Amino acid sequence: MYYSAGTYESFAHPEKPKDVDKKSAYIIGTGLAGLTAAFYLVRDGQMKGEHIHVFEKLDLAGGSCDGRKDITKGFFMRGGREMDNHFEVMWDTFRDVPSIETPGISVLDEYYWLNKHDPNYSLCRASVNRGEDAHTDKQFKLDKDSAMALSKLFMTPEKDLEDKKISDVLPDSFWNTNFWLYWQTMFAFQRWSSALEMKRYLCRYVHHIDGLPDFSALRFTKYNQYESMILPLVKYLESHGVHIEYGMDVRNVIIETEGDKKVARQIVYVKDGREQTIDLIEDDLVFITNGCCTDTSCYGDQTHAPDLSGVKNGAGESWDMWKAVAAQAEHGEYGNPDAFCSDVDATNWMSATVATSNEEIIRHIMSICKRDPRSGKVTTGGIVTVKDSTDNWYLSWTINRQPQFKSQDKNMVLVWLYSLNTNREGNYVKKAMRDCTGEEVCREWLYHIGMPTEKIHALAHDACNTTTCFMPYINAFFQPRKESDRPKVVPDGAVNFAFIGQFAETPRDTIFTTEYSMRTGMESVYTLLDIDRGVPEVWGSKYDVREILRACYYAIDKKPISQAPLSFKEREMLKVLLKKVKGTDIELLLKESGLIK
């Protein structure tokens, strides 16, 4: 497997891999990583669909990319997906997955046209005082110490950031900047999250720094992620004969070390309450989704708080399977699940879905986001963060294009919200969010959008239906780590198995994204089948001096470098440097970026 960039490789069709007709594939998990692996086995590996078996414990494909309606409790959306135009593997996949809504076009075409006609951007990024615009005004408000620390982090080698927290590398003044408000709530980072992962994010999205304050860098699907992404991919695979088997609870993959080779020899699973096994030979390929950020999700509804009695450090079937596999490694080459699943107090947050058709509530929504949620177009354009809830729940909420579900009533609006501090009292509801019913969560949200307090209880009870989801491991992949804590997609010496998903290690890319999961799926197939076509590299904006200069301009709030907070000595040095580059292409680059006039 090798990486490539440019259209030469991306437009080419690889030759059929040697002996692929003799091989079979077993994919554990139907999240984006597993479905993408199946896709590349079919399209580029040219493996017969009937040779591909995808195992799923639940009765629905999609893993964490879900969205569903419970006929008794209402709509559930655990989370949303923010997409980037340089998710290279994602778009390489969806350019060949047919739309299930519009005949004759691909999912990529559908998505591309939608976001061209209805581009995303926010008109109110944060609120204060119960629905007033916080006027962050696209400013980062970085002080000199914070800006210098971010620059240093950008350039620090990953090895030097292993097992370090963000708070270990950034100054206290950073937490009061708009940059941190945008960053924390958009990506769900915490102060104790991995400094290494924050560095990856800075490098990966340096080309989007101008779109960070108002989400203009983002693109969204038309419906929820299940209906817009998972379902078309499942239908594509089924049309090629791929067999997806539900109710398959995989407990272990037995791996034997034979000299320099590592060979998967058996899959252990439970089906219909009975433990069974599948014996494997070297031509049987196994793709293991190790770990899951939504494992042990706890659901609540309008009248019930989520039941957290089963939540404890390390508990969860995906972790149990990974631990069973990791225990077979001689030198830790299958990763260290305990690095990610051993502190649920650090890795949890909670989301809720509010369904309402109430006109008064919708008017209050419109007064904040300045758009009609029933227009079918972008509404909030990303989350609205309640800035004065920082010391409480730290609530953010959003309304994507409506309807979010094809089965949704045309007058209904679905609101998604989440809290980073699930163990603190709310500003209005004097309980921790994790202890609240859906109705109580809705009261807190209604309070923050400015509903009259005397109406809040009645509206939350009669005019809204709210479902909730507490996720103990949703931030598990943000835990401080070292490189060896996540197994390589294909470990050294592995003959017929790979690790895929958010807890497999692939260079440069960022977790908590659709692209990361899909990239591991593509890389695993290309490696095990030795497909002779390049995997598109992670977009290289961190190596593009134009993007870096442009990022500097926006980081200092669109000021020329002469207005940056420089000391006398630094200003004198700047004068000398600018004189040296006068009349060169460097001067032109500085002018194009806005750093000099």
Explain the meaning of each model-derived region.
Residues 1-25, 43-51, 69, 551, ...:
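Extreme N-terminal leader/targeting segments of oxidoreductases
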Residues 1-3, 37, 41, 45-85, ...:
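Beta1-alpha1 glycine-rich phosphate/pyrophosphate-binding loop at the start
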Residues 13, 19-149:
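N-terminal glycine-rich phosphate/pyrophosphate-binding loop and immediately adjacent elements
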Residues 89-96, 182, 228-239, 440-448, ...:
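Amphipathic alpha-helical segments that form well-ordered structural scaffolds
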Residues 100-207, 219-220:
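Rossmann-like flavin
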Residues 206-221, 283-285, 290-520, 526-540:
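C-terminal segments that line or cap access tunnels to active or ligand-binding sites in enzymes
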